[in-house]
């Protein structure tokens, strides 16, 4: 549920129903409070369906006709959500502690089930970064597209600001906090892939940003 940002975006959109999940019991409690707040603000015109579990444990047979599915799966060893916290054993990185197990029992099956849950014109967007483990890069993006190639519609780069680090990371030669180094670090931006899939081969959500075709470029 993206720490609640996707839930918030839902209430700011024209969508009428939201489905989400999070295995962390503490953030889940916060989501419930957020829903109470937004429902009061919007007059209770929207409905939500949230589950305190991982995506692999959702009742997928009950989830159908989804118009838009967006997910950013935990990047295996890179994002260890709720580490040391209550019910950490429900997190995908804990349950599947080898890349191949994580891929085969969580990442790819959940992606397939998400695609299956779409309506005939629905879209699925997956933001995933190839994790690097002990110097080896695992091609999560390629593996996803290879599995769902018949429904692959395109890819876009998502611009992301640098994630903050603690002051202890930035020290000068004397061991003191180096604000200039921290400021320089925070100026950095990077690009992450968002892969786009749909059952509808004629759907093109990127058409509004296209200026020309490659064929026309060479004519």
Report each predicted region and the residues it spans.
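Class I S-adenosyl-L-methionine-dependent methyltransferase catalytic core
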Residues: 1-219
């Amino acid at each position: 549920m993206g720490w609640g940002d996707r839930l918030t975006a839902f209430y700011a959109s024209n969508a009428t129903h939201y489905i989400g999940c999070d295995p962390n019991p503490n953030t889940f409690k916060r989501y419930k409070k957020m829903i109470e707040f937004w429902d009061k603000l919007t007059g209770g015109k929207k409905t939500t369906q949230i589950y305190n579990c991982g995506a692999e444990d959702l009742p997928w047979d009950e989830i159908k006709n989804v118009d838009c599915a967006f997910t950013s799966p935990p990047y295996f060893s890179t994002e260890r959500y709720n580490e040391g916290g209550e019910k950490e054993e429900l997190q995908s990185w804990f349950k599947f502690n080898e890349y191949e197990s994580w891929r085969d029992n969580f990442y790819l099956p959940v992606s397939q089930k998400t695609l299956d849950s779409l309506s005939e014109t629905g879209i699925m967007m997956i933001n995933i970064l190839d994790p690097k483990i002990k110097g080896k890069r695992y091609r999560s993006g390629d593996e996803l597209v290879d599995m769902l190639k018949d429904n692959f519609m395109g890819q876009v780069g998502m611009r992301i600001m640098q994630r903050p680090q603690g002051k202890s990371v930035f020290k000068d030669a004397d061991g003191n906090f180096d604000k200039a180094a921290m400021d320089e670090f925070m100026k950095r931006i990077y690009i992450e892939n968002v892969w786009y899939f749909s059952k509808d081969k004629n759907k093109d959500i990127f058409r509004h940003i296209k200026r020309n075709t490659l064929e026309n470029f060479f004519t």
